[in-house]
């Protein structure tokens, strides 16, 4: 990807003997100057990475020994940017602005009537999951966050550094039982988990629920003929220097899947469902209905296999008065998982005694480790995050809430 570098920032921090390089930047479209959210930021051939936030911004912490490695920024529809880490170093004190050019339109992007249909492409992709995804044990280091909102006001925040072990991407016998083993490295939360409205959210382990939403890992795709016939092929795009199939489904729910033309690996998917009207639960003279779900899952290739890169899920539940059927309040749960390190073919396991429990992470927190979080790859805050902070800090600063 060709970038125009406007200004830059890169500094080295020391914690004991360990040195960390931090690259701060902004990725945006060169022509429109619009930010590019969830672009992948990584080191070529290495297992670490992060993603840009909704404003295209990122802070990428990496070992100082990587200064001679190649920084890579990838985005669907754009050509890759690659440059040595040392070459983007600057002491100006300002984040670097990366202006990205879209990939040129190719003749192959024109869909010909006698080529593969969208359903054909998706069918092949689903049949090749075990070829394209890891079939040996692996570890993922990641950052998890969830926020809860009631009537437009954020009431709680929870963040965790996690380690995830999985045997492989073999199709599970039970798609509703978590196969991964998760170890909690650090957990921090706001005091909002004591808010009276938290009882109107699921009290189970929400990270476990999120992992079970991985459509590829848990084979959560319809694959009958009627469904596949409804899948449409869209104009091809580009990612990581090669062409990508794009297929969509619009009946009853929205689905958009990006599939690598070289090997039919699913690299990205987006899905959204609307209100169903079905009653979810009843409580204290009220009942709740499902108001919709929006999900994004992104994968990144490492050593020839696809590993989850990031995942976001937004789910909405509305609560009504049982007697009058009037809307009392709306709730929204937002969850995100960023994978910042992959360890393939691992010999390390997560023991049963180390596994997170199946109840809520808010009950599994531990003393706040400020030094750890200072150099940990999280998703950079946005103005939306600052709205979250404003809501949560009405009593005391969030940092103090973490410490408490």
Task: Report each predicted region and the residues it spans.
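Short Pro-Gly-centered beta-turn/loop motif in secreted/extracellular proteins
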Residues: 33, 60-68
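Short, acidic Ser/Thr/Gly-rich low-complexity loop/linker segments typical of extracellular
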Residues: 47-57
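A short, solvent-exposed loop/turn motif at the edges and junctions
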Residues: 72-83
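Surface-exposed, low-complexity/disordered segments
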Residues: 82, 96-230, 237-242, 286-404
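Structural motif
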Residues: 22-36
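Bacterial Sec-dependent N-terminal signal peptides
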Residues: 1-26, 41, 107, 403-404
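Extended beta-strand-rich segments in extracellular/periplasmic secretory proteins, especially
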Residues: 216-271
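Hydrophobic beta-strand segments
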Residues: 39-43, 56, 71, 112
């Amino acid at each position: 990807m060709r970038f125009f570098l406007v200004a830059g920032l890169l500094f080295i921090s020391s914690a004991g003997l360990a040195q960390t390089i931090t690259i701060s930047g902004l990725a945006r479209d060169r022509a429109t100057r619009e930010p590019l959210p969830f672009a992948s930021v990584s080191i070529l051939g290495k297992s670490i990475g992060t993603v840009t936030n909704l404003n295209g911004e990122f802070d990428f912490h990496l070992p100082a020994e990587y200064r001679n490695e190649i920084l890579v920024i990838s985005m669907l529809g754009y050509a890759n940017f690659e440059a040595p880490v040392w070459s983007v170093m600057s002491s100006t004190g300002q984040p670097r602005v990366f202006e990205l050019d879209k990939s040129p339109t190719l003749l192959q992007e024109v869909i010909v009537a006698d080529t593969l249909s969208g359903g054909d492409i998706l069918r092949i992709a689903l049949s090749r999951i075990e070829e394209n995804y890891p079939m040996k044990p692996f570890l993922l280091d990641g950052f998890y966050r969830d926020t809860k909102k009631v009537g437009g006001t954020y009431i709680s925040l929870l963040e965790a550094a996690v380690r995830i072990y999985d045997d492989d991407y073999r199709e599970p016998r039970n798609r509703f039982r978590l196969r991964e083993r998760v170890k909690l490295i650090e957990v921090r939360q706001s005091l909002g988990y004591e808010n009276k409205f938290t009882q109107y959210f699921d009290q189970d382990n929400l990270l476990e629920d999120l992992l079970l939403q991985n459509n590829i890992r848990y084979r959560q795709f319809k694959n009958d003929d009627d469904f596949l016939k409804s899948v449409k092929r869209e104009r091809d795009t580009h990612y990581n220097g090669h062409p990508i199939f794009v297929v969509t489904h619009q009946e009853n729910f929205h689905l958009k899947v990006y599939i690598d033309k070289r090997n039919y690996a699913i690299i990205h998917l987006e899905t959204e469902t609307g209100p169903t009207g079905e009653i979810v639960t009843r409580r204290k003279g009220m009942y709740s209905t499902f108001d919709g779900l929006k999900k994004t899952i992104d994968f990144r290739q490492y050593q020839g296999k696809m590993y989850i890169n990031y995942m976001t899920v937004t789910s909405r539940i509305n609560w009504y008065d049982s007697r009058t059927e009037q809307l009392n309040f709306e709730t929204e749960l937002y969850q995100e998982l960023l994978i910042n390190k992959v360890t393939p073919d691992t010999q390390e396991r997560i023991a049963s005694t180390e596994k997170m429990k199946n109840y809520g992470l808010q009950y599994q927190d531990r003393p706040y480790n400020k030094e750890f979080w200072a150099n940990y790859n999280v998703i950079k805050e946005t103005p939306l995050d600052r709205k979250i902070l404003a809501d949560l800090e009405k009593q005391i600063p969030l940092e103090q809430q973490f410490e408490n």
